[in-house]
């Protein structure tokens, strides 16, 4: 079926993972009410009448903090497989990982110096 026989289960998982949301969206398209006016355009707030407008401005600190979090979260995603296969990869992979970590530490120092981690 697949060129890499060890990955048949993974391919099946990917197909199911793509089919379930697609099936949910298609089912919603056929079963949902067709009304486009009135209550459908209102903001839903826990079954209560909405209080105030739906558009509010967030402080930029939330975005900066989230951006720094995403950067270091992605770092963890990249470093975990490297740590698992550390003994097989050799010295070159170790040097590459050190360069990667150094770049991220420079980015952390820059964010710290610019005050992106300050909350006050």
From Swiss-Prot:
Keywords: Membrane, NAD, NADP, Plastoquinone, Quinone, Thylakoid, Translocase, Transmembrane, Transmembrane helix, Transport
Protein localization: Cellular thylakoid membrane
GO cellular component: NADH dehydrogenase complex; plasma membrane-derived thylakoid membrane
Thylakoid in keyword set: yes
Domain of life: Bacteria
Keyword Transport: yes
Pfam families hit by this protein: Oxidored_q4
Major localization listed first in the record, in broad terms: membrane
Stated family: Belongs to the complex I subunit 3 family.
Protein name: NAD(P)H-quinone oxidoreductase subunit 3
Organism: Parasynechococcus marenigrum (strain WH8102)
Gene name linked to the record: ndhC
